[in-house]
Amino acid sequence: MNNDNKRSAGGLGLVGDIGGTNARFALWRGQRLESIEVLACADYPRPELAVRDYLARIGESVANIDSVCLACAGPVGAADFRFTNNHWVINRAAFREELGLDHLLLVNDFSTMAWAASRLGADELVQVRAGSAQADRARLIIGPGTGLGVGSLLPLGGGRWEVLPCEGGHVDLPVTSPRDFALWQGLQARYGHVSAERALSGNGLLALYEISCALDGVAVRASSAAEVGALAMAGDAQADAVLEHFFLWLARVAGNAVLTVGALGGVYITGGIVPRFLERFIASGFAEAFASRGKTSGAYLQDVPVWVMTAEHPGLLGAGVALQQALDAEG
C-alpha cells in the first residue's frame, strides 16, 4: 500500500525502545505518545511478533501502522541489526514486508535521548545547575548507566534538529587530584586503558567503591552498583564518598565535552544512575566542579545550565521525534 493511501486510511506511527530484557512500544499520534506497553523480549522469537502482540493488546490493527521507529542498543548501520543482549535480529526488508510498512527507521538508543531533549516539558526536567541556555547552540546529552552515553543535539532552525552520536564515553578519564590518581591507578590495574566509562557507569561505580575500600582499608559491603547506592543512601560513609566522587568526575567529563562541542545550549543528564539518586546529586559538588578549572575554560562554562531528565519514557519520546522529523523531511 502506498504512503498516501495508508495515511488517508488513518495511518499511525509506532515507536519502540528495545533493550536487552524489555521492549517498550507506543503509538505515535499527533506528535504524542499513546498506549505505552512493556513486553519481555524473551517471550518472542522475533521483534515483528512482539509488535503484532503489542498491537493486539491495545486493540489496534497492523494495517493502520505505516511508519515505525525503533531505538536499538548499539551502533545502527544500513545492514541488519543484531541485538547484543538478546536473541532478536531485525532484517529491515523482512520487517517492513511482514508489517506492511512504508517507513522503518532504526536509531541508536542513546540518540533517542538526544531527540527527547528537544521536546521534554518543564515537568520532565530538573535543573541542577543555573545558567542561560543559548538557543542557537548545541546541547550536550550525557548519561551514565550500563555504559556512558554521550551525544549532542544541533538546532537546524524551523524546529528541526540533528543528532550527532559519538563515542565520548571512551575518552580518557581526567585526573585532577591525588585521590583521582589513586582511583585511576586502581582502574588501570584492572583494565589497562582507563576511559571515562570505566568510572562513570554501573560497573564503574562498583569498581570505584571496591578500589576505594582497598585504599582505605575498609571492608567491602556491596557487590553491585545498586548496593553501593543503597549503602550511600543509608548513610554509609565509604559508599557516600564514592558516590560523591562519581558525581564530581561526571562534572569534569561533562564540562570537557561542552568545551569540545561548544554546547552552550545546555547539558542534559540521563541514564539509570543520576535520576535514581537525584536528591543526593543535587546536594553534591557537581554544579561547582563543572566549571571549576582554568580561567578561560571556567569562564566559558560558567553560564551553562544543566538539567536531569526525569521523563518516564524518554526513549519512546525520542523515537517519536526522530520519526516525525524523518516523515516531515519527506513531505
From Swiss-Prot:
ATP binds at G16, D17, I18, G19, G20, T21. Its EC number is 2.7.1.2. Pfam families: Glucokinase. It comes from the Bacteria. One of its GO terms (cellular component) is cytosol. Keywords: ATP-binding, Cytoplasm, Glycolysis, Kinase, Nucleotide-binding, Transferase. It catalyses: D-glucose + ATP = D-glucose 6-phosphate + ADP + H(+). GO terms for molecular function: ATP binding; D-glucose binding; glucokinase activity. GO terms for biological process: glycolytic process. It is found in: Cytoplasm. Belongs to the bacterial glucokinase family. PANTHER family: GLUCOKINASE. This is Glucokinase. It comes from Pseudomonas aeruginosa (strain ATCC 15692 / DSM 22644 / CIP 104116 / JCM 14847 / LMG 12228 / 1C / PRS 101 / PAO1). The lineage of its organism: Bacteria, Pseudomonadati, Pseudomonadota, Gammaproteobacteria, Pseudomonadales.
